[in-house]
């Protein structure tokens, strides 16, 4: 019996959602952070989308956001020329890292001791979070603003992307190992530690490269311009979203398009699989995040599979929420929660 994809809609942001990231799996589940042009990154329970808190302090659009592995710290990159590190449990601001231009990307090392940043000033910076007064190490070499920067290979190397170039750096020597040039703008990068795979999107292309050597593995072509793509943790599927408001799901091994569907009311800017692979999240120009099931119909999070009577002739549809909660009621709850904030709302530091 056919099942219909019914996403969970996470409201609360008032401007386009431009970045999102999941934590690792913790004793309390896993968590999701979103970056938005409204300047108010939000933290949510990863498997349900339930709002937990809003980090207040930035004075401009937030372009990048990430969580460390155990979800105890968050980091954000913003148009106010700062990156900030937060206590993800209390919501308190821990430090503000001043930059000379707009900051677009942040990433923690596995031990959470260092933070990598990149932005419009074309420099990669590495901050020792145990020495907040120390000057960061700087890596130069990009010729345009940096869109994404990621630690890889157990933090021994760094991957970074500017407009049309992806570069691989050695952390110890701070030197470039290799670079890839593209004939159009790189829109996103994702690093998969298991297998050392780098996912790159540009134009309508979704390309997979070795994160160690940058050698090509395979590539797929989508029907529309793609802004972001994510590979399933078990490398069975990949999902991608872009300018046509659609999400596409592909078989990673064959490249076959398995399904495509709309849900957002604007271009999709970011998409990521959860760490357990049970769902993926998307963020859009329409100001919402949506959570989608990898396997439609499975009881998971707020999805409860409810099958109609066999003789009804209806499509089976996964019911969202607890048995007594309607989809409309969940939307109302999300709207009410959108005005809530962490009890601590730190002021921006100079």
From Swiss-Prot:
Subcellular location: Cytoplasm; Nucleus
GO molecular function terms listed in the Swiss-Prot or TrEMBL record: mRNA binding; RNA binding; signaling receptor binding; U2 snRNP binding
CDD domains tied to this protein: WD40
Biological process terms in GO annotation: alternative mRNA splicing, via spliceosome; maintenance of gastrointestinal epithelium; negative regulation of transcription by RNA polymerase II; negative regulation of transforming growth factor beta receptor signaling pathway; neuron differentiation; spliceosomal snRNP assembly
SUPFAM superfamilies: WD40 repeat-like
Entry GO CC: cytoplasm; cytosol; nucleus; SMN complex; SMN-Sm protein complex
Keyword Plastid: no
PTM annotation (Phosphoserine): residues: 312, 335, 338
Nucleus as UniProt keyword: yes
SMART domains cross-referenced by the UniProt entry: WD40
One Pfam family from the record: WD40
Major site of localization recorded for this protein: cytoplasm
UniProt keyword annotations, A-Z: Cytoplasm, mRNA processing, mRNA splicing, Nucleus, Phosphoprotein, Repeat, WD repeat
Alphabetized PROSITE patterns for the sequence: WD_REPEATS_1 (PS00678), WD_REPEATS_2 (PS50082), WD_REPEATS_REGION (PS50294)
Repeat region (WD), residues: 12-56, 57-96, 98-137, 141-179, 180-212, 221-262, 263-302
Assembly description: Part of the core SMN complex that contains SMN1, GEMIN2/SIP1, DDX20/GEMIN3, GEMIN4, GEMIN5, GEMIN6, GEMIN7, GEMIN8 and STRAP/UNRIP. Part of the SMN-Sm complex that contains SMN1, GEMIN2/SIP1, DDX20/GEMIN3, GEMIN4, GEMIN5, GEMIN6, GEMIN7, GEMIN8, STRAP/UNRIP and the Sm proteins SNRPB, SNRPD1, SNRPD2, SNRPD3, SNRPE, SNRPF and SNRPG. Associates with the SMN complex in the cytoplasm but not in the nucleus. Interacts with GEMIN6; the interaction is direct. Interacts with GEMIN7; the interaction is direct. Interacts with CSDE1/UNR and MAWBP. Interacts with PDPK1. Interacts with TRIM48.
Family per record: Belongs to the WD repeat STRAP family.
PANTHER family recorded: EUKARYOTIC TRANSLATION INITIATION FACTOR 3 SUBUNIT I, SERINE-THREONINE KINASE RECEPTOR-ASSOCIATED PROTEIN
Described purpose of this protein according to its UniProt entry: The SMN complex catalyzes the assembly of small nuclear ribonucleoproteins (snRNPs), the building blocks of the spliceosome, and thereby plays an important role in the splicing of cellular pre-mRNAs. Most spliceosomal snRNPs contain a common set of Sm proteins SNRPB, SNRPD1, SNRPD2, SNRPD3, SNRPE, SNRPF and SNRPG that assemble in a heptameric protein ring on the Sm site of the small nuclear RNA to form the core snRNP (Sm core).
Name this protein carries in UniProt: Serine-threonine kinase receptor-associated protein
UniProt organism field: Homo sapiens (Human)
Designated gene of the protein: STRAP
